[in-house]
């Protein structure tokens, strides 16, 4: 590798990590991409670090995610709910599927969306190919239905709707623009500026 490429790589690594550290120092965390074991580990670590460093002080959580693994997302959700620091969630771009659940997990009154943000809610699905005996398939089906009910209840509570509305709305992909998401109750307000406080 030529020397200039090495220098550029080192500069990018140092700059990127310095920017990330500055955001963390200002209690800003990001989910940019799918909810995975790796991204949830990163988020939970940052949430717990910030809680330990200064309990009860605001954390801003920016979300641009197509969703992902439910169990990974629920780890982040539970952490948000168990720490004393209020978590202000912000949808920038898209908060879909598990991303929408994390958006809704923020402190009520402090969940916002950027003007061109989108939210999508739907029922959970089983990914990949399952090769199993019929009895095990039944177990998987029962588990996904329990998960569906749990997620619908979480969103119903967060949005102030009866669970029957969520069951109907999440039967298929349900998209909302910024104004629709506010009206639905999954966020509370439109973000009109970037808050560095």
UniProtKB/Swiss-Prot annotation:
List the InterPro entries hit by this protein, alphabetically.
ClpP, ClpP/crotonase-like_dom_sf, ClpP/TepA, ClpP_His_AS, ClpP_Ser_AS
Q: Which GO terms describe its molecular function?
A: ATP-dependent peptidase activity; ATPase binding; serine-type endopeptidase activity
Q: Could you state one GO biological process linked to this protein?
A: protein quality control for misfolded or incompletely synthesized proteins
Q: Which UniProt keywords apply?
A: Cytoplasm, Hydrolase, Protease, Serine protease
Q: Where in the cell is it found?
A: Cytoplasm
An example Pfam family from this entry, by short name, is CLP_protease
Name the Enzyme Commission number(s) assigned to this protein: 3.4.21.92
- Uppermost EC category: hydrolase
List, alphabetically, the Gene3D superfamilies matched. Answer: 2-enoyl-CoA Hydratase, Chain A, domain 1 (3.90.226.10)
PROSITE patterns in the record, alphabetically? CLP_PROTEASE_HIS, CLP_PROTEASE_SER
Q: Which reaction does it catalyse?
A: Hydrolysis of proteins to small peptides in the presence of ATP and magnesium. alpha-casein is the usual test substrate. In the absence of ATP, only oligopeptides shorter than five residues are hydrolyzed (such as succinyl-Leu-Tyr-|-NHMec, and Leu-Tyr-Leu-|-Tyr-Trp, in which cleavage of the -Tyr-|-Leu- and -Tyr-|-Trp bonds also occurs)
Q: Which residues form the active site?
A: 97 (nucleophile), 122
Q: Which GO CC terms are listed, alphabetically?
A: cytoplasm; endopeptidase Clp complex
Q: How does it assemble?
A: Fourteen ClpP subunits assemble into 2 heptameric rings which stack back to back to give a disk-like structure with a central cavity, resembling the structure of eukaryotic proteasomes.
Q: Family assignment?
A: Belongs to the peptidase S14 family.
Function description: Cleaves peptides in various proteins in a process that requires ATP hydrolysis. Has a chymotrypsin-like activity. Plays a major role in the degradation of misfolded proteins.
What is the name of the protein in this document?
ATP-dependent Clp protease proteolytic subunit 2
Native organism is Leptospira interrogans serogroup Icterohaemorrhagiae serovar copenhageni (strain Fiocruz L1-130)
Q: What is the lineage of its organism?
A: Bacteria, Pseudomonadati, Spirochaetota, Spirochaetia, Leptospirales
Gene symbol here is clpP2
């Amino acid at each position: 590798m030529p020397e200039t490429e090495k220098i550029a790589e080192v500069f990018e690594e140092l700059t990127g990590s310095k920017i990330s550290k500055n955001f963390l120092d200002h209690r800003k965390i990001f989910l940019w991409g799918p909810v995975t074991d790796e991204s949830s580990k990163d988020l939970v670590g940052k949430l717990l670090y910030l809680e330990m460093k200064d309990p009860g002080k605001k954390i801003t959580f920016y979300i641009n995610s197509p969703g992902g693994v439910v169990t990974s997302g629920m780890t982040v959700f539970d952490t948000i709910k168990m720490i004393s620091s209020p978590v202000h969630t912000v949808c920038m771009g898209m908060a879909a599927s598990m991303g929408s659940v994390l958006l809704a997990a923020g402190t009520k009154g402090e969940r916002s969306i950027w003007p061109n943000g989108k939210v999508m809610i739907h029922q959970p699905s089983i990914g990949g190919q399952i090769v199993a005996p019929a009895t095990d398939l039944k177990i998987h089906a029962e588990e996904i239905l329990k998960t569906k009910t749990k997620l619908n209840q979480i969103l119903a509570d967060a949005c102030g709707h009866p669970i029957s509305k969520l069951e109907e709305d999440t039967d298929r992909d349900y998209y909302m623009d910024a104004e629709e998401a506010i009206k639905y109750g999954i966020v509370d307000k439109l973000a009109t500026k970037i808050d560095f406080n």
